């Protein structure tokens, strides 16, 4: 130890550079490991990462020459015809989220509002992902099938609009359309990229389902 301290004292600049370089290398390794863990390990609400298959894009070829190729996200017709009927799957859910077009969530009097990211999904979503509900619960299968405008909101949205997380049964607006709040969940980490949103509503409330016709969406 004394010899090491003596060497550091003899060439302070080189010693500082060596120490900082070693510390930076260790920090970079730690960051890489942390990013790998948060993108692969299971944690709430994405507790089933290790046994979940994600289908995010589909490729289509031209019928005649097989040369015209296109890639896009899945359309609802393809999900209904090919994914929902899968017998080997414990649960199948469809998620439609426009990360580039958040909606304005507001109180009924319009005095409080918050730009929020919306996830359009189905009832199986709440089986695949495990959320911590502070009050209420997910929208029911009957509400989903009927296209009733129910919404599950995050704790931060509830606090921003109402000042409390005990808001089940109250109403709010999403881009001036009224929704009934059926559940409030703890805020979700953005690292849970598939489950993350700030408001979750049935995709059946949209006239077009949020998808194009056919296999593309």
PLM features: what roles do these ranges have?
Residues 122-139, 149-217:
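Mid-to-C-terminal secondary-structure elements
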Residues 7, 11-41:
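Short, strongly hydrophobic transmembrane alpha-helices
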Residues 32-104, 112, 215-217:
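Membrane-proximal extracellular/periplasmic loop immediately following the first transmembrane helix
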Residues 1-9, 78, 82:
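A short amphipathic helical element positioned immediately N-terminal to and/or at the very start
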Residues 15, 34, 38, 73-81, ...:
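Short, conserved clusters of charged catalytic residues that mark active-site
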Residues 65-76, 111-116, 145-149, 188-200, ...:
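Solvent-exposed, non-transmembrane alpha-helical starts
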Residues 103-110, 175-177:
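Short strand-coil-strand connectors
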């Amino acid at each position: 130890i004394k010899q090491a301290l003596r060497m550091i004292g003899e060439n302070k600049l080189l010693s500082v550079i060596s120490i900082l370089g070693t510390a930076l290398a260790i920090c970079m390794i730690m960051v890489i490991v942390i990013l790998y863990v948060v993108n692969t390990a299971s944690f709430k609400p994405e507790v089933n990462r290790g046994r979940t298959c994600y289908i995010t894009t589909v490729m289509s070829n031209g019928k005649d020459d097989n040369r015209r190729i296109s890639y896009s996200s899945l359309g609802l017709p393809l999900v209904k015809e090919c994914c929902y009927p899968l017998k080997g799957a414990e649960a199948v859910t469809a998620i439609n989220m426009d990360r580039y077009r958040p909606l304005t969530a507001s109180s009924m009097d319009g005095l409080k509002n918050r730009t929020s990211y919306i996830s359009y999904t189905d009832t199986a979503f709440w089986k695949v992902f495990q959320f911590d509900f502070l009050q209420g619960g997910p929208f029911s299968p009957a509400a989903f099938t009927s296209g009733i405008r129910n919404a599950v909101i995050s704790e931060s949205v509830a606090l921003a609009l109402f000042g409390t997380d005990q808001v089940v049964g109250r109403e709010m607006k999403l881009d001036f359309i009224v929704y009934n709040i059926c559940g409030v969940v703890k805020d979700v980490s953005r690292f849970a990229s598939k489950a993350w949103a700030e408001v979750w509503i049935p995709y059946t409330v949209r006239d077009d389902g949020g998808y194009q016709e056919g296999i593309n969406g």
